[in-house]
Every structure is written in C-alpha cells, then in structure tokens.
Amino acid sequence: MQIPKEIFKAYDIRGIVGKTLTPEIVEAIGQALGSEALDRKQTTICIGYDGRLSGPSLAEALSRGIRQAGVNVIQLGLVATPMVYFAAYELGTACGVMVTGSHNPPDYNGLKMVLAGETLSGATIQSLRARIETGNLKTSDLKTGEGKQSHHDIAAAYIAKIVSDVKLARPMKIAVDCGNGVPGAYAKKLYEALGCSVQELFCDVDGHFPNHHPDPSVPENLDDLITALKN
C-alpha cells in the first residue's frame, strides 16, 4: 500500500481528512503501530481523540489496524492530549495515540504517538511508513487471535491527580475560552475542583469551530477572552 509521504512529519502524522488522511490510511498506520508495539514487547495501546468531526471514525480505524496486529486497544473517547499520556501511565500500558489536528484548520487531523514510554518522532515515525510500504506488518491469526478492544473513562482520575498536586493560595475567579475545542469538555470541572469560579466562553465542543479557531497563538483569537477579563 502506498501512503502519502508528506503526512509523516517530524513529531506526528498529519494530513487532510478524506484526501491524504483517510480511514484506510489510518487503519494501515494502526497495523504498523501495532507491529512496532509487539516488537517492543508492548501489548496494549490507549487511543483518544479531540473534538474534530473526523475524530471518532479515525480512532475506530486506528483501533482496527492495531487489533489486526494482535494488540489490545483501550478507547478513551473524547479527551485532551495530556489525558492520553496520563492514561498510558495510569493504566500501565506505556503506549498511547492521540487523534488530534492540534492547531491546524478544521479539515486536518493527525496522530501523536507514544510507544513503551517513548514519544515517537523523526526516524521512528518514518519507519512506520516503511513498514506499510514493505509489508512488514504483523497479522493476527487463529493461534494468536485479534487484539481486544475495551473502553475506559479516564477523566475522573485525571482531574483527581491534578487536584492532589495543585493547591491554590486563594480562590480565583477566571475566564476560560476553549474556542469550542476539546478542553471545553473538562475545563470547568477541573478549575472548579481547584477552587476557581469559572466563566466559560465557547466551551461546547464543536469541530466546526463556529466562534474562532482554538489556537491562542493567533492574537485575534484572544479578543473575546480579553473582553471578558475587562468586564
């Protein structure tokens, strides 16, 4: 199978959904990732996805590929990227994949990957493409069996861990603009647990990003938050 070379970046895999990043391509990447995991003696990979519209379907395609290699999958559902890394530690898998478009436009999505505690980058990411192109893929059979899939809600443990580590010197009143990105699913609950009074802006998760793009490095995306603070 030929995979677009340009989607394999230095620190992640990233492409345009339906063009350079399709469910079929992601499934093949999943099988390559599962094969690499087995070579590293890893048996289970956590998967999460952000609020982009393509997230659930790409996460399921990724899971199919990983399980085809004989590796188990724990689906975390809609989560922020740090929650996948936390789950890999908390659940003892040492492996996780976040399906996320990061700061890119809505028609993009991608994969950030950790195997055996290593964040994949550079040559290791390129080796996944090489596995697919050369057919160096493990495939489950009647003897080994396909990997199993389960689901786990990591949110409560994630929030509890942060609350146990962070103590505010005094209560705070804060405004949070999530730009309709995935943090909106958890921000209020987390900050209130820390003792904050929270004013929410655009915290409904919506992959269309109807208000502004969830990229705070662009100055105009901070306009609504600045207005809220002034008021």
Residue ranges and their predicted role:
Residues D39, T44-Y108, K189-N231:
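N-terminal small/polar loop signature for handling phosphorylated ligands or for N-terminal nucleophile
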Residues N109-N231:
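Gly/Ser/Thr-enriched, mixed-charge loops and adjacent short helices
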Residues R14-V17, D50, V79, M98, ...:
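Gly/Ser/Thr-rich beta-alpha loop segments that engage phosphate groups in nucleotides
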